[in-house]
From Swiss-Prot:
Catalytic site positions: E174 (proton acceptor)
Residues of this chain annotated as glycosylated in UniProt: N190, N284
Keywords associated with the record: Developmental protein, Differentiation, Glycoprotein, Golgi apparatus, Gonadal differentiation, Hydrolase, Membrane, Transmembrane, Transmembrane helix
Descriptive protein name: Nucleoside-diphosphatase mig-23
InterPro entries in the cross-refs: GDA1_CD39_NTPase (IPR000407)
An MF annotation (GO) of this entry: ADP phosphatase activity
Protein family: Belongs to the GDA1/CD39 NTPase family.
Record membrane topology: Multi-pass membrane protein
Gene: mig-23
EC number of this enzyme: 3.6.1.6
Reaction(s) catalysed (UniProt annotation): a ribonucleoside 5'-diphosphate + H2O = a ribonucleoside 5'-phosphate + phosphate + H(+)
Length: 553
């Protein structure tokens, strides 16, 4: 009976053991899939906007949740502010000393690493996108700077630095990125919006997007959506897809987008000073009266050829605006625009037949600074108020403006802004009205710095565009996890069945053993002695069975 009891205990133990294994397996499988599906992986990205006057760092992070929605990217926040840092001068100044380019970016890389978990850094892409400043330097200098960054930057940071992520971007892509950023910030890509944009596919419901004008130091960009049925054909028409699936038209957009290289405010000043120099040569003098500076402000200008002259401010803003207009619409224009075959923007750029006065437009960078920092008129655009305030400001003596600045009456403006405000306000308004034909009275234009409390930068749009495939990667991974989990669930029933069969087998063996190993009294009742039984066991060749049972006993 002792052997039988052992077999019974063994069977019960086996059943409990197998049941525990199956339960643990089931719980672990459920826990794994829940952790993967509920706690999505957070990813990071770094982008440097290498502009004409400096380079700015932006650090973003995101959690992709669905391949049917646009990737949700946000700036990394530290101390209630987005992580951002600007260094000067611009990257283009290293054209003559390219070996120092990577070291110049070291402070930005070090700051980014402080806000990215160490284990995430090798998988964090770094984008170095240079804009107008780098476009203007000689080709050999461009290549030397880029080569240094591609070679040396991986030695400075543990983040992911790829050769193709360090480049000079075309001006139109700067415009596309800005367009993406502003519409993303406004929620125009959300599926919850229902109004159809004219010309989109039947039944395709999405919000009407807005246009944008970004006025930088060296260039200006414009971008707005065209209806699908618009037949305007130009190299400035770009089709983009922000979704992670190429066959999904929901996030596909047709844009008019172009850049005006050399028409940023700082390049505008250079153009203006060249015209002043030309006038001065006709007068054989060294000092010229300048309507685009406050009264009695003096500025010495050194031209590229080494010639010097002095600008002396007269503070006549209306005359300044008229002079600036001539810079946008020179007498020499393209034959297409002269023949009026097509509508054209300034710089003889053919334009679609869409009145921008009727398009909701947002102005960035200098459109905000030049209306807000000194004039205090940022926001909804009012041409009359801007002209009036500009005329009042520029008509002041420079000494009066300096005194007001010392009293903190211009808290948002440094001295350089105060000196150039007259020209810049004339430039941005002339570009808007004379360059893009936006009506001065009836328009939907506004200048902005932030949207929904967030500073809008084209860097955000660039990150959204280049990381758009992340949701597809994560959804594919989750699908594999689910399929694996489903397959494992199908094994539970066979495991239970096999465990039951095994336990039953052990019980049967135990029962058989108990019948063979009964006591002497029962054997005697059958007319058997221990000796006879033992002899018969040997005679019937039950040795192997005995050995088998002895192993279990």
């Amino acid at each position: 009976m002792r052997v039988s009891r052992r077999f019974t205990i063994l069977a019960i133990t086996a059943m409990i053991f197998l049941s525990l294994i199956i339960c643990i397996y089931a719980v672990a499988a459920h826990t794994t899939v829940n952790v993967i599906l509920q706690k999505q992986e957070r990813s990071y990205g770094v982008i440097c906007d290498a502009g004409s006057t400096g380079t700015r760092l932006f650090v973003y992070n995101w959690v992709s949740t669905s391949d049917s929605e646009l990737i949700q990217i946000e700036p990394v926040i530290y101390d209630n502010k987005p992580v951002m840092k600007k260094i000067s001068p611009g990257l283009s100044t290293f054209g003559t000393k390219p070996d120092e380019a990577a070291e110049y970016l070291r402070p930005l890389m070090e700051l980014a690493e402080l806000h990215i978990p160490e284990e995430k850094r090798p998988y964090t892409p770094v984008f170095i996108f240079a804009t107008a400043g780098m476009r203007l330097i000689p080709d050999e200098q461009k290549e030397a700077v880029l080569t240094n960054l591609r070679t040396e930057l991986p030695k400075i940071t543990s983040m992911q630095v790829l050769k193709e992520h360090i480049r000079i971007i075309e001006g139109k892509w700067e415009g596309i990125y800005s367009w993406i950023a502003v519409n993303y910030a406004l929620g125009k890509f959300n599926r919850t919006f229902t109004p159809d944009f004219p010309g989109t596919s039947p039944g395709q419901q999405r919000s009407k997007t807005v246009g944008m004008i970004d006025m930088g130091g060296a260039s200006a960009q414009i971008a707005f959506e065209l209806p699908d049925n618009d037949d305007f054909n130009s190299i400035n028409v770009e089709n983009i897809n922000l979704g992670c699936r190429e066959d999904d038209s929901l996030f596909r957009y047709k844009l008019f987008v172009t850049t005006f290289l050399g028409y940023g405010v700082n390049e505008g000043i250079r153009k203006y000073e060249k015209t002043l120099m030309a006038k001065l040569k006709d007068q054989n003098g060294t000092v010229i009266q300048d309507d685009c500076m406050p009264l009695n402000l003096h500025k010495t200008v050194t031209m590229e050829n080494g010639d010097n002259f002095v600008r002396r401010g007269t503070g006549n803003w209306d005359t300044c605006a008229a002079e600036v207009k001539k810079l946008l619409n020179p007498e020499t224009s393209s034959e297409v625009c002269k023949a009026e075959v097509a509508k054209c923007y300034f710089g003889a750029v053919p334009a679609p037949n869409i009145p921008l006065s009727n398009v909701e437009m947002y102005g960035f960078s200098e459109y905000w600074y030049s209306t807000h920092d000194v004039l205090g008129l940022g926001g909804q655009y009012n041409a009359e108020n801007i002209a009036k305030k500009s005329e009042q400001y520029c008509g002041q003596r420079w000494s009066t403006i300096q005194a007001a600045s010392k009293k903190n009456l211009y808290p948002r403006a440094d001295e350089e802004r105060l000196k150039t405000q007259c020209f810049k306000s004339a430039w941005i308004t002339s570009v808007l009205h004379d360059g893009f034909s936006v009506d001065k009275t009836h328009n939907k234009f506004q200048s902005v710095s932030t949207i929904a409390g967030q500073e809008v930068q084209w860097a955000l749009g660039a990150m959204i565009y280049h990381m758009r495939f992340f949701p597809l990667r994560d959804s594919t991974r989750n699908l594999i996890v689910k399929e694996t989990h489903s397959a494992s669930e199908s094994l539970w029933a066979p495991l239970f069945f096999l465990s039951a069969v095994f336990c039953l087998f052990v019980l049967v063996c135990a029962k058989e053993h108990s019948l063979l190993c009964f006591d002497d009294k029962r054997r005697a009742s059958f007319g058997l002695t221990r000796r006879q039984y033992s002899y018969k066991m040997l005679k019937e060749d039950r040795t192997s069975s005995s050995a088998f049972l002895e192993n279990f006993a």
